[in-house]
A protein has these predicted regions:
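Residue-level marker of beta-strand positions
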Residues: 86-88, 156
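Short, cysteine/histidine-rich loop/knuckle motifs that typically chelate Zn2+
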Residues: 55-58, 72-75
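Well-ordered alpha/beta subsegment
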Residues: 128-190
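Short functional micro-motifs and their immediate structural scaffolds
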Residues: 64, 78-79
Length: 191
């Protein structure tokens, strides 16, 4: 799990006291419990602007979000591996009524399910390496209404990170300006 020198090998840094990680996102407190080593490690890597996935040492399949055992073979043996952070919108939810007050000024906003280019259709045609995250602008702010209207299933995106504190960051998705985009990405008929 990581390398001893990066301070992330056990999810909390070798030789350090186990402590909850705290941050802030859109003015809301973020807490990653000290018992959640997998997510602590994931968000710490994000804090270093690195997107990493767990790779099973037995079946060699990557997985996101982090889990304590491989969903494909049930092995607990894994290592954190970097992934490129580019992919395609597999599905999305367009939110028009914010439950959290901090999101109200950003309506409508998108919650994307992105299928990463690594491990597409593996181990079967209906599976892949997927990660959720908000659609954002390149500066890490939530996407504008205009950007939301341009994104649908098939849009090419890449990861960016919004710092939430000294050690952790939130992975977000921005339109990949370097990638070929669909002329008209498929969108749910809501307007």
């Amino acid at each position: 799990m990581g390398h001893p020198r990066d301070g992330l090998s056990d999810g909390n840094g070798e030789g350090h006291l186990v402590m909850s990680l705290r941050g802030e996102y859109l003015g809301m407190p973020v807490l990653i419990d000290d018992l959640d080593k997998d997510n602590q490690t994931f968000y710490r890597y994000c804090g270093q602007n690195e997107l990493r996935a767990q790779e099973c040492l037995d079946c060699r399949l990557k997985r996101l979000p982090p889990t304590s055992a491989c969903p494909f073979c049930a092995s607990e043996r894994m290592e954190w591996r970097p992934v490129e952070g580019r992919g395609t919108v597999y599905s999305y939810g367009e939110v028009h009524h914010a439950i959290q007050g901090a999101f109200r000024s950003h309506l409508p906003y998108h919650l994307l399910l992105v299928e990463l280019d690594e491990q597409k259709d593996i181990p079967n045609p209906y599976d892949g390496l997927r990660l959720q995250g908000n659609l954002a602008e390149i500066d890490g702010s939530l996407a504008t209404k205009e950007t939301v209207k341009r994104v649908g299933i098939g849009t090419r995106v890449k990861v960016t990170f919004k710092q939430m504190g000294d050690e952790i960051a939130m992975p977000l998705w921005v339109i990949d300006q370097e990638a070929e985009q669909p002329t008209t990405p498929w969108r749910y008929p809501i307007e």
